[in-house]
Amino acid sequence: MGEHCDGKMILFHAVYLLFLHSLLKFLKMKREDIEKLLGEEKANYLLNHQSKTISKDQLHLPNKKFIDTIWKDSNRNIQTLRNLSLIAEHGRLGGTGYVSILPVDQGIEHSAGASFAPNVPMFDPENIVKLAIEGGCNAVATTYGVLGNVARKYAHKIPFIVKVNHNEFLSYPNSYDQIMFGTIRDAWNMGAAAVGATIYFGSEESKRQIVEVAKAFEYAHELGMATVLWCYARNAAFKTPEKDYHVSADLTGQANHLGVTIQADIIKQKLPENNGGYNALNFGKTHKKVYSELTTDHPIDLCRYQVANCYMGRVGLINSGGASSGATDLAEAVATAIINKRAGGMGLISGRKAFQRPLKEGVALLNSIQDVYLSKEVTIA
């Protein structure tokens, strides 16, 4: 009798937890919540915008059946499709077509001290993975060493994206070149669902990086892993006294187009802040319609041009959350998520804003980002 009651109680708790998980997953951020956070003027600017550049009807938008609607006719093998699906089905955004990813590669890219001193527990690899799990992320993207250190404990609990190349920041004088830190085979051995890499498009070393990453992605696909490309413009000439064109829509858009050409499955890109890099720097080739018809100065339209360069959304665009600014982090993260979603993007990859604060605050920030993608009030522009 006692064993029977215990069994019923266990079943009750299991059903209750499943119900609670479903309820929390579909809590939606209301417009009034956004207005309170961003202020009415900025909220209206982002939420009321109707894009008249590239029509949303021309885009392949994120959806719960994106494997069938977008990827089934591609050359990706069955294992790669399964791993793309594994990422898409995990976390609070699982089954929506959108993704929320925690990236923590800054210990190499920016130095461990600069990255983790604000929140000392993050020196421990396990706490990085715990934040991604408790934060309801689709995946955790971090270094070869971090994931290798905890792979046996966590590879089956959250999809791993192993970042295989980095710009180490200890050489003097500092240089900007992405070099390989790990191997594709070992990423597969530790149970990774995907590998990630960075290319500095426009840099002196970019041609070598393109060849290296293209070969790495080919092997990753052969083994059945998905591929994520950090798609950054990088050249000292791109920054002028007037503007920083590293975040220009036309230059970042072309970086995206090069990235999908080497068969990245997901593109990570900085949110565009301006446009006209080609014209201001007087190099490369562009077209006047890029500026007169395909973009405006509205951030959603600039981001949509980035999406268009990802094969009109066939390859998902995730924008980065940027550096931590302190008290304004939550508002900035929510605004970035709104811009990405309304432009036709696939999600947000937010690191420093989340991991450079106590666990509960980091989880709350990640959940707020996810709430934007779950909200029916935040629509495609």
Residue ranges and their predicted role:
Residues 313-327:
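Active-site clefts of carbohydrate-active enzymes
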